[in-house]
Amino acid sequence: MSAKLINNSGTFGCIYHPGIPCNPNETVGPEYATKIHSNTNQSIVLNEIAISNKIKENIPDYADYFSPVLDACKVNLANVDAGNCKFIKNKTSVQFVSTKMKFIKGHALLKHVKQLTNMKAYKEVATLYDKICLAVEKLNQIHVVHFDLKSDNIIVTKSGTPIIIDFGISMDMDNVIASIDKGSVSKNASVSKLSLSNISMINPSVSRKSESSLSAFPPLLDYSFYTYNTDYSTWCVDIILISFIVQKQKPMDIITSTQIMNIFDEVMRKNNFANKKYLKDAVVLYRVNFKLNVADKFNNVENVKLLNHLITKYRKWDIYSATILFIKMLEQIKQFPSDAHKEIIIHNLGFVE
């Protein structure tokens, strides 16, 4: 069976099934898919392998929740049918990296939910949310943040099991926190545990900045919090604030409560939280508490002090993203949350402690 392109929408690669073999004399079984990456995405590939290793080594039942990278190798352009994969079709690279993973037959989360038409739709959506939150808790236990928990990165199987995929921009928080304490640390420290002999052309460097350590954040922070964007609903206020500090500021620059609250208000507005009746009062209270406990507390202090405070809350980041998805799922089936779920939503969005 020849491999066919099944997803060309990814920013960093195209997915083929049953896959592209590392050795042209071999075949890849239908239980696997492969993602073909451009050689320009070196750090993304190595990072996904490193995170995948940590998941496989520390979560015994990982296959029930995640589809991490199982193997990786170089592939030759001659062995790849470009299809509609733009970066292959345009030949922006002559060498490509293939990452092998379990093939998950199903639909992206919101597409799956859109097809629910029976009276049990609410119960099914609530169950999906519970399962996603359980998966997030398993990542939290090993200090990993997925960081891109959106609909396309959760595939729901025919049996109704959500499987989380794509760990390309995920974070090993042990390394991130260590990088703040000790300076730059390789995000890919555990990569050596998976054989990379066939993809030796990859350079694991994650630094984009050349400034001295006195004027710039550690390269790992620059890599992890790679963009400041208040439009991305998957990210909570804490992440967006950290991204603002890392991308727009320097460690010893002074940040003000006005700057902090302006970012807070923009995020609330762009997420349209205040127009959701069941969240309106909670948003008002959240703003009061955020101003008191964050903006006023860290008014006129060095950026690095606020960053150190926010980074410790990383266990809430993916739960926030999962809750945003829960809200979107409820909107898909045109239902409001029950009173019990309202309280859970408000808590998991971080609107109350």
Residue ranges and their predicted role:
Residues 140-157:
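Catalytic-loop of the protein kinase fold
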Residues 135-139:
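Conserved hydrophobic alpha-helix
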Residues 63-124:
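Conserved structural core of kinase catalytic domains
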Residues 342-353:
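Conserved C-terminal C-lobe helix
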Residues 162-163, 167-334:
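C-lobe/activation-segment region of protein kinase-like
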Residues 4, 11-80:
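ATP-binding glycine-rich loop module of kinase domains
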